[in-house]
Amino acid sequence: MTDYPIKYRLIKTEKHTGARLGEIITPHGTFPTPMFMPVGTQATVKTQSPEELKAIGSGIILSNTYHLWLRPGDELIARSGGLHKFMNWDQPILTDSGGFQVYSLADSRNITEEGVTFKNHLNGSKMFLSPEKAISIQNNLGSDIMMSFDECPQFYQPYDYVKKSIERTSRWAERGLKAHRRPHDQGLFGIVQGAGFEDLRRQSAADLVAMDFLGYSIGGLAVGESHEEMNAVLDFTTPLLPENKPRYLMGVGAPDSLIDGVIRGVDMFDCVLPTRIARNGTCMTSEGRLVIKNAKFAEDFTPLDHDCDCYTCQNYSRAYIRHLLKADETFGIRLTSYHNLYFLVNLMKKVRQAIMDDNLLEFRQDFLERYGYNKSNRNF
């Protein structure tokens, strides 16, 4: 690859950890890192307008290749002028490869060297996704950052299976690079796999780094392993990745996991967590999680989070938001979703300042002491 639509600029490494302060330059703008990326599965972040996402400070959003391929179709989106125009978002977009959804949503999967045959989860029809097809779909979507097609083995699968899987993923990555028809305006990332096996992560990283991708994703985590196991994998994986390229931890959105990922040198994160739990009335606050539907909030006229300056907390009370959710009013979900997204995007803003000030470990301790991390919050 001779041209570089995606560029990473390292501004500072924190003195006491591997945390990196930087920025990523894309064809649709520059965003600071570390950054949490809201997920817009169906070309929309659920209940949020583009204007609201900009007010939150979302410098980049993620959309899902698998879902947009099935509905409304990548060719239709291309005819509309590309995903940015289709959804009226003029800032950077990252698309995944569709691989994770194939393995997690689709039925009757059959994995071969050529690709994956599976049943469409919407109508049961037979579908086939190959490395070349995954790249073609993303080329049609026109995202700024694309992902190679990979297999995401379960964390506790046997060693021999995972070894064969990562070797196939490396061959798929090479095929995807060759199929990429828009290298001048779309950056392609490779995805490091290997479950919890250090030697396989090392092999996967070496294969992909040799292909000179514009960035590297760490896949196969946040799939049921413990927080400690995730950190252990990051401890031996991120040092294998080039310092001059972005590092992206896929599918992670719990506050402690974000901070611990940053400490280990990760630059980008995404997760559906903030909007998913918001729809059930669970809110992230500086004092821990808050389940707003609880009866004790029926006459609580204070904000969701006393330390939050988001639109929701500046204008609406716990009692009002609880009323909306109990009445099944969509506006309640909009308010809780806005708040949760703001909470994580703003957390990353505070993390960036802590890196600048060389006090990230102190920030982590103070944050988690207030947040009250325990087993009940661990998956939150």
Swiss-Prot record:
Domain of life: Bacteria
Enzyme nomenclature, EC number: 2.4.2.29
Record pathway: tRNA modification; tRNA-queuosine biosynthesis
Binding residue positions for substrate: 96-100, 150, 193, 220
Extent of the signal sequence: none
Active site annotation, chain numbering: 96 (proton acceptor), 270 (nucleophile)
Gene Ontology biological-process entries: queuosine biosynthetic process; tRNA wobble guanine modification; tRNA-guanine transglycosylation
CC cofactor: Zn(2+)
Co-factor: note: Binds 1 zinc ion per subunit.
Family, per entry: Belongs to the queuine tRNA-ribosyltransferase family.
HAMAP family, per database record: Q_tRNA_Tgt
NCBIfam families: Q_tRNA_tgt, tgt_general
Subunit record text: Homodimer. Within each dimer, one monomer is responsible for RNA recognition and catalysis, while the other monomer binds to the replacement base PreQ1.
Name of this protein: Queuine tRNA-ribosyltransferase
